[in-house]
């Protein structure tokens, strides 16, 4: 220990010192020193280095000594904290170290102010106790040096050149910083790292192939470092020199004699901004014109002599480009067509045409429906007339057929009765009997069919039998017409169904049987009592 120890501590005999050292021998009880193994401090900030002793029962902390290990292995005292005499700071640390908890024997921590790079190293906290002796603990301190990044633009960028340096970003710190780029511009970058005794520097360069679209685009260098609470950014705006194509505008709407305020404009973008010159190829510029920037303005009304081919030349140090325009001046102002009015008029005309077409269509459809209705009525009337005529014909045919059949049956019956006695031959009698049975069966069949047809057609009104205004004599005359002899009896009855009802006036029904009404002309068939 240094000379200061003798001044601060009372004289201690060699016997007492040996006794203190033996107390921590195997089997003895010793305390524990608590501290951090490693700590970091940002350059220029304060850092607290803890050292706390957990004493056992009967132990007493006399003082705490802070030492820094040197490169040659020697320890250098920087602070001594005594429970009775206070703190002493040594050498270059004087004024930069203070006690963390003054007059607290158990807490031997110190605060190092305004940390600098030479403060990096290994520190030793030694606790002197009685009667246990000394206890040591080491602490590694690292000082972070945040970088101060810088960004430098490359040489001027010109459109059409090859790969060119756009910007370079450099940052130096401890430990080495990390550099990245943020941009919408397409390009490549290279990074180089350089080591220094107490720091490291990093340089990153960004390369592009210049185009006019890059002009004005941001290019940002992003620096990351443990000493930063957040990333740092440095932005550079790219400047690309170029000259765009030239065009003359302003005469497209048509110039005419007497037009006021006529102007021509020369459009040509570029970086730097180009300068403009005006001329007329077929002569000098007209009088009373003013050139202001990229505009050629006529200060008077136009005349026919102002026509010609005008030329504009733009230059900005990168190059020179020009363009021409032929200006024609009409004698009179061209009639302008109001597109809005034309559109509205067209819409109105189209609407009117559509309405007319709609009305005509409705009229034609209505007329067509009326014609169809009329034709349908005529058809119905025609069919009704034909139906009445067919009904009369069927009625006449049925009446005549019925009368003829009755007369034939009556005659056959009379002949059968008159010659019954003369026919003695059994075979002839048998044939006559069978013939009579067949006739009886035919008559009954005809009556049954007549009854069925009468029931089905009972709903037919009597008015259908004859036309309006037809006299009974006409009906009787039609009934006297002879039927078609080639038409079978059964078919006659079927064909004249609508007029059976009139003929059935001579019959009546009894227990499901059709019986003829008694009359003077009635005859009996086959002797069975059926009156026809």
UniProtKB/Swiss-Prot annotation:
**One Pfam family here:** V-set
List all topological domains (Extracellular).
31-344
Q: Provide the membrane topology annotation.
A: Single-pass type I membrane protein
Q: Which residues are glycosylated?
A: 189, 282
The answer to keyword Disulfide bond applying to this record is yes
Q: Which residue spans traverse the membrane?
A: 345-365
- UniProt keyword list: Cell adhesion, Cell membrane, Disulfide bond, Glycoprotein, Immunoglobulin domain, Membrane, Repeat, Signal, Transmembrane, Transmembrane helix
Under InterPro entries, the record lists: CD80_C2-set, Ig-like_dom, Ig-like_dom_sf, Ig-like_fold, Ig_sub, Ig_sub2, Ig_V-set, IgC1_2_Nectin-3-4-like
Q: Where is this region: Disordered?
A: 152-179, 453-491
Any ranges marked Cytoplasmic in the topology annotation, and which? 366-532
The residues covered by the Ig-like C2-type domain are 146-235, 244-328
Q: What is the stated purpose of this protein?
A: May be involved in cell adhesion.
PANTHER family with a match to the protein in the record:
NECTIN-4, NECTIN-RELATED
Name listed for the protein in its UniProt record: Nectin-4
Name the source organism.
Xenopus tropicalis (Western clawed frog)
């Amino acid at each position: 220990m240094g000379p200061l120890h003798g001044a601060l501590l009372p004289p201690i005999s060699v016997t007492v010192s040996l006794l203190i050292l033996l107390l921590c021998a195997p089997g003895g009880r010793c305390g524990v020193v608590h501290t951090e193994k490693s700590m970091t401090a940002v350059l220029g900030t304060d850092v607290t280095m803890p050292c706390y002793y957990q004493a056992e029962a009967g132990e007493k902390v006399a003082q705490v000594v802070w030492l820094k290990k040197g490169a040659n292995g020697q320890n250098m005292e920087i602070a001594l904290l005594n429970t009775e005499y206070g703190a002493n700071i040594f050498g270059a640390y004087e004024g930069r170290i203070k006690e963390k908890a003054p007059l607290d024997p158990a807490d031997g921590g110190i605060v190092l102010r305004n940390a600098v790079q030479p403060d990096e190293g290994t520190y030793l906290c030694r606790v002197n106790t009685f009667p246990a002796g000394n206890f040591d603990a080491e602490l590694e301190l690292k000082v972070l040096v945040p970088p101060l990044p810088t960004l430098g633009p490359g040489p001027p960028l010109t459109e059409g050149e090859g790969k060119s340096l756009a910007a370079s970003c450099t940052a130096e710190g401890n430990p080495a910083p990390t550099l990245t780029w943020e941009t919408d511009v397409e390009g490549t970058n290279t990074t180089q790292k350089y080591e220094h005794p107490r720091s490291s520097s990093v340089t990153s360069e960004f390369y592009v192939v210049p185009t006019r679209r890059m002009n004005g685009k941001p290019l940002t260098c992003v620096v990351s470092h443990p000493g930063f609470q957040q990333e740092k950014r440095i932005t550079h705006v790219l400047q690309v020199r170029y000259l765009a194509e030239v065009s003359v505008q302003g005469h497209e709407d048509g110039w005419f004699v007497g037009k006021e305020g006529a102007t021509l404009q020369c459009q040509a973008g570029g970086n730097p901004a180009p300068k403009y010159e005006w001329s007329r190829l077929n002569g000098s510029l007209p009088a009373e014109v003013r050139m202001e920037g990229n505009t050629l303005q006529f200060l008077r009304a136009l005349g026919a002599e102002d026509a010609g081919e005008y030329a504009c030349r733009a230059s900005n140090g990168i190059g020179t480009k020009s363009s021409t325009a032929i200006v024609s001046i009409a004698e009179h102002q061209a009639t302008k067509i109001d597109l809005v009015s034309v559109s509205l008029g067209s819409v109105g005309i189209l609407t009117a045409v559509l309405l007319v077409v709609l009305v005509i269509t409705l009229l034609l459809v209505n007329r067509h429906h009326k014609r169809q209705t009329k034709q349908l009525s005529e058809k119905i009337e025609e069919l009704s007339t034909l139906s009445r005529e067919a009904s009369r014909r069927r009625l006449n045919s049925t009446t005549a057929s019925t009368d003829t059949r009755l007369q034939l049956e009556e005659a056959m019956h009379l002949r059968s009765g008159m010659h019954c006695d003369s026919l003695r031959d059994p075979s002839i009698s048998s044939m006559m009997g069978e013939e009579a049975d067949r006739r009886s069966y035919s008559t009954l069949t005809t009556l049954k069919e007549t009854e069925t047809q009468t029931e089905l057609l009972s709903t037919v009104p009597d008015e259908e039998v004859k036309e309006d205004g037809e006299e009974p004599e006409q009906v009787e005359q039609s009934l006297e017409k002879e039927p078609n002899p080639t038409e079978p009896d059964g078919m006659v009855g079927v064909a004249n169904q609508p007029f059976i009802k009139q003929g059935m006036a001579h019959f009546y029904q009894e227990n499901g049987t059709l019986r003829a009404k008694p009359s003077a002309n009635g005859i009996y068939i086959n002797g069975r009592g059926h009156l026809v």
